[in-house]
Structure formats: C-alpha cells, structure tokens
C-alpha cells in the first residue's frame, strides 16, 4: 500500500474542495438568479470539462501552465518554481477540471428555492449578502454538499489530468490513481487491488456520510 500517494491524493482532494466551496456558492447563486446575455455561453464553458477527454483537457492545461506561457512565467517569477509537475499545479488543474462537478449541483440547489421565499427576504429588508447567509444558503445547502462530495470523490480518482499536468513524481504529484496504474504496469495486481479497494472504501464512506448529513439538514429545514 502506497500511503504517501494516498495522503497526497487526500490533500489534493481537500485543497480542491476548499477552493471550490466558496466559488461554487457564489457562482452557483449568480448563475441561478442571473438573467444576462451570455449566460448560456458561461454555463457551456463551465461544463466543458465534462465532454473533453481528461488527457485532451490536461494537454491544454499543460500548454497553458508551461514555462513559456504567460501563466507559467508569472508563477515562476512569483514563486521561483514551475507550475507544471508540481503539487500546486495539480491543485490549479484539479480546480479547473472539477468546476462542473462543483458549480452545477450548487446552481440547481439555488434554483430549487421558491421565488416567494426570495421575495419575502427582500420584502423584509435583507441585503443580498444577508439573504445569502440567512435564507439562500441554508435552503441550497444539500445541493452545495452534493457538489463538494462529487468534487472530493472525483478528485480522488483523477488520472488523465494528473498524469498530463503533474506526471508521476513520488511525494509531489504521484497520486493514488497513478500509483494503481504503476502497479498494474508492473503486474502487481495484488498491490493495485489493495489500493483500489481503499479508494472505493473512502469514496463510499464519504458519500454515505454526506447522504446522512443531507438527510439531517433536510429534516431540520422541514
């Protein structure tokens, strides 16, 4: 069992969730309530990672984050190291690749809030910011939780993006999915099976726990 790869995968998943949690709330609410020109285009761009093969998407991110790109050069100047083939590069790539898994469920959660509830909040004089925290977010929280669970579970199993942007550097970019692939390549099916089983157990436990929490939140709101 490659515990280093598992720990790195968990760190990557937690960092991705931490970045996308506030982003999914703000972007999901904006897309749910907004009525503006170009909304369909923005939604299509958010959903783009779902239809592109991970290796293709990873290739374009590799080009965008490379040393000769504006983003890569700026990162090199600010932090003194390359963005590609680093853990930080994996986090950035994972955040971009998981945008649809984070934003779409949150958006659906906000869209499910009755218009009458939002109108009542406005009638009571709540500012948009207070309405978000006092009314919208508690009602949309099951959707937000679903978004974070999907993001966490999807990040744990990411392969194509990780391989293209981060490679397989032990202790830096070698995630559990890459470690499983390496074991299969070495015909170590027992080792690969053990790591795959651990990954399934973590994902199942996360989903089960979140379903239980969502049910509790739903009963309280009811």
Where are these regions (language model features)?
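Membrane-helix interface segments
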Residues: 34-42, 70-71, 85-86, 128-129, ...
């Amino acid at each position: 069992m490659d515990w280093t790869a598992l720990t790195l995968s968990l760190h990557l998943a937690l960092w991705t969730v931490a970045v996308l949690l506030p982003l999914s709330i703000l972007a999901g609410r904006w897309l749910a309530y907004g009525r503006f020109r170009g909304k369909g285009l923005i939604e299509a761009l958010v959903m783009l990672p779902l239809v592109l093969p991970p290796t293709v998407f990873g290739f374009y991110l590799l080009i965008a984050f490379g040393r000769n790109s504006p983003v890569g050069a700026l990162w090199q100047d600010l932090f003194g190291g390359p963005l590609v083939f680093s853990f930080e590069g994996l986090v950035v790539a994972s955040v971009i690749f998981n945008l649809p898994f984070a934003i779409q469920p949150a958006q659906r959660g906000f869209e499910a809030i009755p218009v009458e509830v939002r109108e009542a909040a406005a009638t009571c004089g709540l500012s948009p910011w207070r309405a978000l925290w006092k009314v919208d977010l508690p009602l949309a929280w099951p959707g937000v939780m679903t978004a974070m669970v999907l993001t966490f579970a999807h990040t744990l199993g990411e392969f194509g993006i990780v391989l293209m942007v981060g490679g397989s550097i032990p202790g830096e970019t070698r995630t559990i999915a890459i470690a499983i692939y390496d074991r299969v390549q070495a015909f170590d099916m027992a080792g690969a099976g053990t790591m795959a089983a651990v990954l399934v157990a973590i994902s199942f436990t996360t989903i089960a726990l979140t379903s239980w929490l969502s049910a509790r939140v739903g009963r309280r709101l009811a």
